[in-house]
Amino acid sequence: MIPWLEADDPFPNVSSALTEADGAPGLLAAGADLSAERLLLAYQNGIFPWFSEGQPILWWSTDPRMVLFIQDFKISASLKKTLKKIDRSMIANGRWQIRFDHAFEDVMRACAAPRNGEAGTWISDDIIAGYTRLHRLGYAHSSELWLDDELVGGLYGVSIGNMFYGESMFTRVTDASKIALAYLVRFLGSHGVSMIDCQQQTAHLASLGAMPISRTEFISLLRQAIAAPQIMDWKPIPMFEVN
């Protein structure tokens, strides 16, 4: 049994989250709301919302936790070639551009669009409204790939101190979300961020260098990261030295 949270209730300790034996590993609580204050409190404690349409708000703290250490991000030879092309395009104000926070809500809605083999989405209008509020406060950001001024891929997440929590990504052209992630990783690394929270284990994330760590280790690293000053100047930088 998990607790039901009223508006002013604190989150329970993450150690009380359900386990594999309970059938919903990582489920911590239900209820409360998606206010900016509640979302920030959740992320500061290693908790995130995830629920389907028709369900109450469900709060999770998974164990193990999937994370991407910046130094472990994998760039294939083909992706590296593409990134160099985009670097040159950015410098020359060409067809391909990377932008941060240019169309945050559009990125969220693209991430919410139905995908092959999936019946629905967890990114509801309430989720979009909640994270858009965080974006206006400077705590949620998007990394976007544009082609001929059309949004063709990207991702969004939450930033607190030196911690970035990845939420969802989408792609409309080959490798678009990987490209947006690569530029985000480059930017975050330049600002002292060492880890991106990926929440749950997937083969796709593992292929990019993400790995599972224990919740205890994650919370320890999280505490250090969120104590750092907030990153303020969100502007993409080139991946490589371009001649």
Curated annotation (Swiss-Prot):
GO BP terms: protein catabolic process
GO cellular component terms given for this protein: cytoplasm
Family matches, as NCBIfam families: aat
Lineage: Bacteria, Pseudomonadati, Pseudomonadota, Betaproteobacteria, Burkholderiales
Protein EC: 2.3.2.6
A Pfam family assignment: Leu_Phe_trans
InterPro entries: Acyl_CoA_acyltransferase, Leu/Phe-tRNA_Trfase, Leu/Phe-tRNA_Trfase_C, Leu/Phe-tRNA_Trfase_N
Entry function: Functions in the N-end rule pathway of protein degradation where it conjugates Leu, Phe and, less efficiently, Met from aminoacyl-tRNAs to the N-termini of proteins containing an N-terminal arginine or lysine.
Protein name (Swiss-Prot/TrEMBL): Leucyl/phenylalanyl-tRNA--protein transferase
Reactions catalysed: N-terminal L-lysyl-[protein] + L-leucyl-tRNA(Leu) = N-terminal L-leucyl-L-lysyl-[protein] + tRNA(Leu) + H(+); N-terminal L-arginyl-[protein] + L-leucyl-tRNA(Leu) = N-terminal L-leucyl-L-arginyl-[protein] + tRNA(Leu) + H(+); L-phenylalanyl-tRNA(Phe) + an N-terminal L-alpha-aminoacyl-[protein] = an N-terminal L-phenylalanyl-L-alpha-aminoacyl-[protein] + tRNA(Phe)
Localization terms from the record: Cytoplasm
GO terms assigned for molecular function: leucyl-tRNA--protein transferase activity
Uppermost EC category: transferase
Keyword Metal-binding belongs to the record: no
Family per record: Belongs to the L/F-transferase family.
Gene for this chain: aat
Matches recorded under HAMAP family: Leu_Phe_trans
